[in-house]
């Protein structure tokens, strides 16, 4: 083999190894928690939307008889509304903090701030680790990365009103969570 071919092969191997090491640096607990938080926040927002509100969708084309061919879908499951929710979902990541399960010592990010209709139902704070704004900004970055990467998949999952959206999104579509996470989770 000529020396330049060996050099090119060496450069390609080095580049491949560099890509592999940077891919594996994603914090699994962080990205899994961000994915779960996205599903939880969108589910909550959908549940707070009036189910009677409908929106017209379709091309608004005229049929040969002069009538319109549009259809109504629930606002909460419309692509327009879900896109609006996705634009805002990562702002709520400041309501999450690192939580260490006292039994298993597993770490994940969980919501610590009660929602408006929770009636002041605060969680037990002794297992939360509040590391300042750095931890919530890391979760927000992970959230934004997931939303940017999987926006179309997230919208189609929530628009179809499928069961176990969190499991489907976080375990099957994005592969950020192991399926064992869902044996312990209430999502």
UniProtKB/Swiss-Prot annotation:
Q: Look up the signal peptide feature and give its range.
A: 1-24
Positions of short motif Prevents secretion from ER: 184-187
Respond yes or no to whether keyword Transport is given for this record: no
Q: Which InterPro entries match?
A: CNPY (IPR042415), DUF3456 (IPR021852)
User: Which pairs are disulfide-linked?
Assistant: 32-177, 35-170, 90-143
Where it sits in the cell: the answer is: Endoplasmic reticulum
What protein name does the entry list? Protein canopy-1
Q: Which organism is it from?
A: Danio rerio (Zebrafish)
Gene coding for it: cnpy1
């Amino acid at each position: 083999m000529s020396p330049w071919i060996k050099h090119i092969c060496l450069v390609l191997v080095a580049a491949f190894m560099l890509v592999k090491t940077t891919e594996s640096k994603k914090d699994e607990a962080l990205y899994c928690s961000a994915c779960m938080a996205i599903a939880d926040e969108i589910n909550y927002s959908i549940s707070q939307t009036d189910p009677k509100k409908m929106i017209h969708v379709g091309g608004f084309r005229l049929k040969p008889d002069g009538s319109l061919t549009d259809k109504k879908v629930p606002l909460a499951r419309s692509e327009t509304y879900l896109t609006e929710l996705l634009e805002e979902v990562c702002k709520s990541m400041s309501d999450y903090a690192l939580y260490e399960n006292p039994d298993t010592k597993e770490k994940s990010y969980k919501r610590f701030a009660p929602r408006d209709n929770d009636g002041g139902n605060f969680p037990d704070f002794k297992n939360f680790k509040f590391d300042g704004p750095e931890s919530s900004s890391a979760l927000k970055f992970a959230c934004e990365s997931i939303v940017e990467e999987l926006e179309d998949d997230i919208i189609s999952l929530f628009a179809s009103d499928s069961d176990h959206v969190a499991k489907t999104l976080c375990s099957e579509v994005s592969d950020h969570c192991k399926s064992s996470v869902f044996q312990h989770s209430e999502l």
